[in-house]
């Protein structure tokens, strides 16, 4: 997570200390905490041709949905309740959540229980579709009201229920794979696309569940295609989209990059007084339109 998202590179000088710190932290945690997965009792799902084809087809769909989700997160982060509205917005937002929660109590909390149910195949098509639509909406509703909270688990749970729903629908045409397997693939794909970090997404789903090793190839296919589609749309992530002054999306940076655009080269340029201002988001397209 630190290397791929915060540092933006998986170079050896970063990976070695990161892995060493992770190993020490894990060994220390084993002394005081139970040595079990975050999501318990997840079956060891197996690879199937049906699941593989579904992953290739569902990846782009999940990527488009993730891109829309990222833009929604970005918009609401820049239009949060302020001033007098900040006193009443949380009451209204959580009141709405409470009413919806009468029918869908799975929406309460960060989504951990919702994801766990999806991973074990709990829930029918209608319920999973409803949750996959409502969870992002209540997340941005609470975020826009001024409430603080992380986005990792809500995003993972949304991908899980969405993957489960699409998988149940797929099973009507090509049965053979359990809904929980589709949920795990969907969770990895949406997390990878939303964070713009496919390696992190794959590793986290495997480690949080201690399962899914038979699904690595479908997970990889869905996660890579979903991340690529979301990247092509604008390249933002759920983290960069929330920044007060957003940098250009990675896609626009790469498409307009100079030969010295790498982080290491940029640091060298800054040291020698050669730093350049990055292009504003959309500046390239505006210049192109202005020029005809």
Which residues does each predicted region cover?
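Alpha-helical transmembrane segments and immediately membrane-proximal extracytoplasmic
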Residues: 1-292
